[in-house]
Amino acid sequence: MKILLLCVALLLIWDNGMVLGEQEVSDNELQELSTQGSRYINKEIQNAVQGVKHIKTLIEKTNAERKSLLNSLEEAKKKKEDALEDTRDSEMKLKAFPEVCNETMMALWEECKPCLKHTCMKFYARVCRSGSGLVGQQLEEFLNQSSPFYFWMNGDRIDSLLESDRQQSQVLDAMQDSFARASGIIDTLFQDRFFARELHDPHYFSPIGFPHKRPHFLYPKSRLVRSLMSPSHYGPPSFHNMFQPFFEMIHQAQQAMDVQLHSPAFQFPDVDFLREGEDDRTVCKEIRRNSTGCLKMKGQCEKCQEILSVDCSTNNPAQANLRQELNDSLQVAERLTEQYKELLQSFQSKMLNTSSLLEQLNDQFNWVSQLANLTQGEDKYYLRVSTVTTHSSDSEVPSRVTEVVVKLFDSDPITVVLPEEVSKDNPKFMDTVAEKALQEYRRKSRAE
């Protein structure tokens, strides 16, 4: 009688929807669901590798553009250096002449200095702010030791060009080194026959040991496997051995780029000429270093401008001709330096573009590689379904919610919750389960 009453009570509870967590599938059904889910994961792996091949093409295109741009840089560098050499020659010839118009220039210089100091310190206090007291003392000494003749022949512009040339050479060398390191790794990665294999190849990414008789992508005699596996590796290759090397090489290439992007060469105080809108910061650094930045403000002082306009041709026509020659070569050198800077910015842009593509490559392929890193066992399924449970009425679980617990290779179990409309009978049931499981796995991978 007690047993009968217990059965009646259970039936009543069942009618009221109070039985939770009823397992609905057999072991055979779990295997079939695992097969269906593994096919979805297999397709996503193919998509990831197809994406990698696309990014590979973009990287190769960027690299070809970089090489072409490097040739233009070399030509521009030669022209710029020739112009700088002409400027230095003219400067040395002009310095060899006795200073003329001294009396006129010295009088103007004495009126120029106070204005230049006031203008410079006002700028420094407003823009640069820190250490104005020390900078003021340095500026006073600098102006007292400077010659109006240096001012008259645009010595500050010449020094600025020479400093820019040094900085540009340093930045180019750093970028070249970065590209050489990253490109070597990328070339090694992309030379593998893995990237030459067509995705429609029947050996490509078929699930391991599925019940139907299809050759799987880790088939021991596959050319793909031979290209990735050392001859010293015997026995059937694993998913881990297939993909983990790619992740490691992509990571190495990224590191080669990132190390250079954050290297001292790129953080050098005066490489700001590579960035737009950084002129004020550059002037601040020049003022702090040796006060020459203040000479850039000579256009704001009338008496300083008058020094540049002094005509000494009456006293020494040859010197006047040399000064004109110097100014002409200086203008050419400044124009070529600006052109070189623009090319260098384009070169830097290609470098940053390659770095961005490597990030995409890592994002596209990282989840596959991390799965490979987890996979050490012999399980024939990419995705294995452990349980499928449907919940009825409960305050914490919505009505008729289906919970599916799966594992991607050797990962920790992942629970996927599906609403009532996505039932086990739905043809897309396992595609939805696999998609959500993969999304959750990738989310956790990024968070780690």
From Swiss-Prot:
Disruption phenotype: No visible phenotype. During myocarditis, mice show an increased tendency to cardiac tissue injury. Homozygous CLU aging mice exhibit a striking glomerulopathy characterized by progressive mesangial expansion and collapse of capillary lumens. It is a peripheral membrane protein. Glycans are attached at residues 102, 144, 290, 327, 353, 373. The keyword tRNA processing does not apply. Proteolytically cleaved on its way through the secretory system, probably within the Golgi lumen. Proteolytic cleavage is not necessary for its chaperone activity. All non-secreted forms are not proteolytically cleaved. Chaperone activity of uncleaved forms is dependent on a non-reducing environment. Polyubiquitinated, leading to proteasomal degradation. Under cellular stress, the intracellular level of cleaved form is reduced due to proteasomal degradation. GO terms for biological process: amyloid-beta clearance; cell morphogenesis; central nervous system myelin maintenance; chaperone-mediated protein complex assembly; chaperone-mediated protein folding; immune complex clearance; intrinsic apoptotic signaling pathway; microglial cell activation. It comes from the Eukaryota. Most abundant in stomach, liver, brain, and testis, with intermediate levels in heart, ovary and kidney. Changing residue 371 to R: Strongly reduced interaction with XRCC6. Keywords: Chaperone, Cytoplasm, Cytoplasmic vesicle, Disulfide bond, Endoplasmic reticulum, Glycoprotein, Membrane, Microsome, Mitochondrion, Nucleus, Phosphoprotein, Secreted, Signal, Ubl conjugation. Disulfide bonds join 101-312, 112-304, 115-301, 120-294, 128-284. A motif (Nuclear localization signal) lies at residues 77-80, 442-446. GO terms for cellular component: apical dendrite; cell periphery; cell surface; chromaffin granule; cytoplasm; cytoskeleton; cytosol; extracellular space. One of its GO terms (molecular function) is protein carrier chaperone. Coiled coil: none annotated. The modification Phosphoserine is found at residues 132, 395. InterPro entries: Clusterin, Clusterin-like, Clusterin_C, Clusterin_CS, Clusterin_N. It holds the Pfam family Clusterin. It is found in: Secreted; Nucleus; Cytoplasm; Mitochondrion membrane. Antiparallel disulfide-linked heterodimer of an alpha chain and a beta chain. Self-associates and forms higher oligomers. Interacts with a broad range of misfolded proteins, including APP, APOC2 and LYZ. Slightly acidic pH promotes interaction with misfolded proteins. Forms high-molecular weight oligomers upon interaction with misfolded proteins. Interacts with APOA1, LRP2, CLUAP1 and PON1. Interacts with the complement membrane attack complex. Interacts (via alpha chain) with XRCC6. PANTHER family: CLUSTERIN (PTHR10970:SF1). This is Clusterin. The lineage of its organism: Eukaryota, Metazoa, Chordata, Craniata, Vertebrata.
